Amino acid sequence: MKLSLCNEVLRHLSFPRQCAFAAAVGYDALEIAPFTLGTDPRRLTPRRIAAVRGALAAEGLVCSSLHWLLVAPQGLSITSADASVRRTTVDLMCRLCDLAADLGAEVLVHGSPVQRQLPGGAAARQDAARQRAAACLATAADAAHAAGVTYCIEPLAMRETNFINTV
C-alpha cells in the first residue's frame, strides 16, 4: 500500500518543505491541490512545474493526483448560468489535465463543492444547472483522455454540496 498526503494541509510550508515533511513521516506521494502552487494554476510556468517535479523527486515522492481543483482563481463554477464563468472554469479543468500529466499524476479528483453547487429554486433551474455541469465534465473528460489521465468526480456529503452526493 502506498500513502499519499493532501498537500494543502501543509500549505503554510514551501513546496520543497512539504515534500521533505511528507517523506520524513513515511508518505510515498503528495495529492496536490493546484491552488497551493499559485494563485492561478493556469499561469504555472514550465520552470515552476519542473521545480515541483524536482522537489517531489528529491524526496523520493511522486504526485499521486490533483484534487480540490477549482479553488483558484475565485469565481469558478461548472453549474453557473454565466457562460463566461463556465468557459473560464472549463479552460482551467482542461489545463489541469495537462498539469496532472506533466507532474506524473494519473488522476484528478473533482471535489470543489462550492464550484458545483446547484442554484436554489425551481426544479427547471436545477436541471439546467445539471446539464451545464455535465457539459463541463464531458469537456474535461475529453481533455483528460487526450492527456492520458483520469478525471474523477468525488461524491461529497450533502452538507458540503447539493450536487453529486453518491455515485
Task: For each feature predicted by the language model, list its residue ranges.
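Active-site acidic/histidine proton-transfer and metal-coordination neighborhood
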Residues: 17, 75-167
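Conserved, mostly hydrophobic/aromatic
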Residues: 5, 22, 30, 56, ...
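Conserved N-terminal beta1-alpha1 strand-loop-helix module at the mouth
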Residues: 17, 21-27, 34-41
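Short N-terminal binding/cap micro-motifs at the start of the first secondary-structure element
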Residues: 11-16
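Mobile, glycine- and charge-enriched loop segments
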Residues: 1-4, 9, 62
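Glycine-rich, proline-tolerant flexible connector loops at the mouths of alpha/beta enzymes
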Residues: 33-57, 112-119
